[in-house]
A protein has these predicted regions:
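C-terminal accessory regions
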Residues: 99-193
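Conserved helicase motor core of P-loop NTPases
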Residues: 1-115
């Protein structure tokens, strides 16, 4: 079972975001792709910032280049997610920019636009300042909707009283190698999961 395999991790309301970000970092530092799935966009921004901090401490990120739509700071080397389909910008492979595409920030142009490389396609793009300011967020953590269709080596799901069993199922199926549930145990009995 997941419990016997150590894939259900007890946590508290106060520490669950730190715990999930630390687990994400352990995987990332081991050169595994990882993702944290949370209930809300606000939670995703919070956890993504914590994940980003681990990258900064390890020296994996460059200069701050722009602020994201959710208020998070974007640095060279950050993984970001586009949040709106647009025909205004085409990637180098002639595909349009899609909602939930994941990119790595590789540079910034003179006008402040972001140069990005797609996470799974061999494509690059330049995202205009206005698009970044309104439609780009950090991608280390995402909502259940944002996780659908995305697969990583190791998945982490923050389970709170708001998390539905359907959402938990989606979240716990994102990792190829393993999936872990970080369960808040101080405010709700999650025995139904």
């Amino acid at each position: 079972t997941y419990a016997q395999a150590g894939r259900i991790v007890e946590s508290s309301t106060d520490t669950v975001f730190d715990d999930a970000a630390a687990a994400w970092w352990t995987d990332t530092a081991a050169n595994k792709s990882a993702m944290v799935v949370v209930d809300t966009a606000s939670d995703a921004a919070d956890v993504s910032t914590r994940c980003q901090h681990h990258l900064m401490v390890d020296g994996r990120l460059g200069d701050h280049v722009r602020d994201a739509a959710d208020g998070c700071r974007i640095h060279i080397g950050d993984m970001v997610q586009t949040r709106r389909n647009t025909n205004e910008v085409l990637a180098s492979d002639h595909h349009r920019i899609l909602n939930r595409d994941v990119w790595t920030v590789t540079g910034v142009t003179g006008d402040g636009s972001l140069k990005v490389r797609h996470a799974t396609r061999h494509a690059t793009a330049t995202l205009p300042v206005s698009y970044v300011s309104n439609d780009v967020v950090l991608a280390y953590a995402t909502t259940i909707a944002g996780a659908q269709g995305r697969t990583v080596d190791r998945g982490h799901v923050v389970v709170t009283p708001r998390t539905t069993s359907a959402s938990l199922y989606v979240g716990m199926s994102r990792g190829r190698e393993s999936n872990h549930a970080h369960v808040v145990c101080d405010s709700h009995d999650h025995t139904e999961f």
